[in-house]
Amino acid sequence: MTDIKSMTIDELKELMTQIGEKPFRAKQIYSWLHEHLVTSYDEMANLPKSLKQKLADYPITALETLDVQISKVDGTRKYLFRLADGNMIESVLMRYKYGNSVCISSQAGCRMGCRFCASTIGGLTRNLLPSEMLDQIYRIQTSIGERISNVVVMGTGEPLDNYDNLLRFIHILTEDGGIHISQRNLTVSTCGLVPKIYELAEEKLQMTLAVSLHAPNDEKRRELMPIANKYSIDELLAACHNYFDKTVRRITFEYSLVAGVNDSKENAQELAGRLKGLNCHVNLIPVNPVRERSFVRSTREAVENFKINLEKCGINGTIRREMGSDIDGACGQLRKRYMEKTESEK
C-alpha cells in the first residue's frame, strides 16, 4: 500500500501521472498534507471530486491521540499516540523562550538495550514510517495551534537503526512546500551506530548529531550500553571527527549521570581527555528514575561538580534543564504504563 504522506513532491507527481492526473496536483496535495496538516481528502478544497475518489485508495497516515499529560511545573506536554496497527508511541512538547520544540519517536520500542532506558525494556516492535514520524509533529502543532520550530529525534527508538525512513523524514520535514523546519533546528540522537554515522556524514546535512556516550571508557560503557560491545569509544569518536569534518557541525555528547557509576571527578577528567581536540559540547543529564532499573541519579552537587571538572579541562558542558518531571517525563514510561494498564484490564 502506498503511504502518500511519506512521498516527496516528485514521487507525488509520478503518482498523479500513473492515475491520469496533471502533475501540478502533486504540489497541491503535498501542501495540504505537510503545510495545512489535514488528515482527509475531503479537507483538500481545491481538488476535484474525481481526484479525491481516486485518492481513496491511498489512506492518509493520521495518529490517534490516546492521552496528553500536561506538566504543572513548566507546561511540558507528553503525548501518547496510537498507530494504525495498534502500536503506541510517545512524543513530548517542550516550550522554550525561543519557540516550541517537539521530541519524537523513531521506532515502536527499541532493540539497543541501554540499561537505564525505559523504552527498550520491551524490545523493538517495528520501525516507524516517515509519515508516522512527521505526524507526531503535525498532531502536536495542530493541538496547540502554534508553530513547532525545533525537532529532536530523541524519543523511543534508535533513529539510525531506521536509517532510510529517517532520511526521508528529514527531507520532507525540511524542504519547501511543507512545514519547512530548518535543518539547523533539527537534532538526531544515536547510541553510536558507527557505520551509520559515517553514512550520515556523507549527506552533509546541517542538523545537530547528538551521541549518547554516558561513560568515559569502554569498560563502563559496556556496563550501560550493549552497543559498546560492538563499537569501542575510539571507533565512535573517529566517526564523530569524520562527521564534523564533513558537515562542520559541532557534535553534542549526551552523558547520563548515575550515582557512583560514572559521575566522579576522575570520570570527568577521563571524559575530557577523550574529547579533547573535537569540536563538541557535553549535555549532562541526571539519569531518569525507571521503576524496573536500580540506577540512582547523581546528586545536584555531583552533577555541578562534574560540569566544573569538565570545563577545567577545556570541555564545554551544560546541565540539561529537566522538563515535565511531574508527568512521567522519561522516555518510554507513559507508553509502558498504558500498555501495562491495557494488559491488566483484559
Language-model segments: what does each one mean?
Residues M1-I89, H241-R250, Y255-K346:
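Auxiliary Fe-S-binding modules of radical SAM enzymes
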Residues R77, I89, N100-I104, M112, ...:
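Generic beta-strand structural signal
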Residues N87, K97, C191-P195:
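Short beta->alpha connector loops
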Residues L93-M94, N165:
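Residue-level structural signal for beta-strand termini and adjacent loop
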Residues R95-E132:
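Canonical Radical SAM [4Fe-4S] cluster-binding loop centered on the CxxxCxxC motif
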Residues T120-N150:
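Conserved alpha-helical substructure of the radical SAM core
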Residues Q141-N150, G155-G317:
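Conserved AdoMet/S-adenosylmethionine-binding subsite of the radical SAM
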